[in-house]
């Protein structure tokens, strides 16, 4: 599936969430995450902490928009250099 189509689907799901429709109608298979350190959230951060930004002392602005999908579980951050998997901060790629 193309990235544009995925973004469209997630945008629609976020819109439904804003309307307070909930995601009960989404098939369970769409709510499964591929990594053991991820979990599905209806309203995750659109600017999650990653290995690239977790040591950055400068605050960044982030839109207050829900991200619908798989996010890293608490205590884990995304490492884009390892295939975008969720790792403990001390295990980030150098």
Swiss-Prot record:
InterPro entries: Ser_inhib-like_sf, SerProtInhib-TIL_Domain, TIL_dom. It is found in: Secreted. It holds the Pfam family TIL. Keywords: Disulfide bond, Protease inhibitor, Secreted, Serine protease inhibitor, Signal. Expressed by the venom gland. GO terms for cellular component: extracellular region. CDD domains: TIL. Residues 25-30 form a propeptide. Belongs to the serine protease inhibitor-like (TIL domain-containing) family. Negative results: does not inhibit trypsin. PANTHER family: ACCESSORY GLAND PROTEIN ACP62F-RELATED, RIDDLE. This is Venom peptide SjAPI.
